[in-house]
């Protein structure tokens, strides 16, 4: 792979080609009310570019050869069997899964290598620590985690036979399906979350900040079938990082949407 930069301020251009070999192992385990997914991998990269060319890519004294370890684990469990003693014990086909706890931990370890900018881990914002600005900091090694409670409102409704989607002659489960036990074809999730992470640099310069980030917030997510989803997250920082101009209490609002046709 190739990385190129053009710096108009310092009138320099960076251009380097890298070779990367990587291996990743993935695992998935599913239960009736829980799921766990994880990955573990390593990568080795090298380049024949000289140090000046590497520096021109945007970071000084980066390693021409480096190795990293990347890992992640995601898990969710539904609390309904705990909060409802009658869950799954009746004759009804539908077993509501309404109250979900989701958690994840992922990160990267770069040993003592200084990585080229394209290989650094970025943190802050959507999908990492939502109370901080997007990609507010980057580093060589990092770890980030999330714990989140999700309330799936449509799954709490009483079961009924399927109806139809407006303007379309197609069955659509607005309510849980009493004939098959399937859940609704749509979901509206109210969530509360806590994100935390730490990011660091190898042999860092004074201006490279090793950062810890903590944030909390709430979110709303709407999905219709498998074709459309939209979500909003409102997060606020729980700690200050003066070097990044972030104060405790600063807020971020995130909107994401997808449509598959």
Please describe what each predicted stretch is.
Residues 222, 249-261:
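Outer-membrane beta-barrel "beta-signal"
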Residues 154, 196-201, 223-227, 237-241:
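Short Gly/Pro-enriched loop/turn and capping motifs at secondary-structure junctions
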Residues 73, 147, 195, 220, ...:
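Hydrophobic, well-ordered secondary-structure elements that form the walls
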Residues 199, 209-232:
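C-terminal structured "cap/appendage" subdomains that terminate the fold
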Residues 2-185, 196, 200-202:
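C-terminal outer-membrane beta-barrel translocator/porin domains of Gram-negative envelope proteins
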Residues 191-193, 228-235:
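Conserved active-site loop/cleft motifs that coordinate metal ions or position small ligands
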């Amino acid at each position: 792979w190739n990385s190129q930069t053009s710096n108009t301020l310092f009138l320099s251009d960076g251009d380097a080609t890298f070779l990367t070999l990587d291996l990743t192992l993935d695992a998935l385990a599913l239960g009736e009310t829980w799921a766990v997914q994880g990955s573990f991998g390593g990568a080795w990269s090298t380049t024949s570019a000289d140090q000046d060319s590497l520096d021109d890519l945007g970071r000084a004294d980066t390693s021409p050869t480096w190795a990293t370890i990347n890992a992640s684990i995601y898990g969710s469990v539904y609390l309904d069997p705990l909060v409802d003693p009658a869950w799954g014990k009746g004759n009804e086909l539908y077993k509501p899964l309404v109250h979900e706890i989701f958690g994840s931990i992922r990160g990267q370890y770069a040993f003592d290598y200084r990585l080229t900018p394209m290989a650094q881990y970025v943190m802050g914002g959507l999908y990492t620590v939502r109370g901080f600005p997007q990609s507010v900091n980057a580093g060589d090694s990092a770890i980030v985690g999330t714990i989140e409670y999700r309330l799936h409102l449509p799954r709490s409704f009483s079961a009924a036979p399927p109806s139809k989607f407006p303007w379309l002659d197609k069955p659509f489960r607005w309510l849980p399906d009493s004939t098959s036990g399937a859940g609704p074809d749509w979901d509206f999730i109210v969530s509360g979350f806590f994100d935390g992470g730490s990011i660091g640099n190898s042999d860092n310069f004074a201006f490279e900040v090793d950062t810890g980030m903590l944030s909390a917030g709430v979110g709303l997510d709407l999905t219709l079938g498998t074709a459309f989803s939209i979500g909003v997250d409102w997060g606020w920082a729980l700690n200050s990082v003066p070097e990044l101009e972030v104060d405790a209490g600063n807020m971020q609002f995130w909107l994401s949407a997808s449509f598959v046709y």
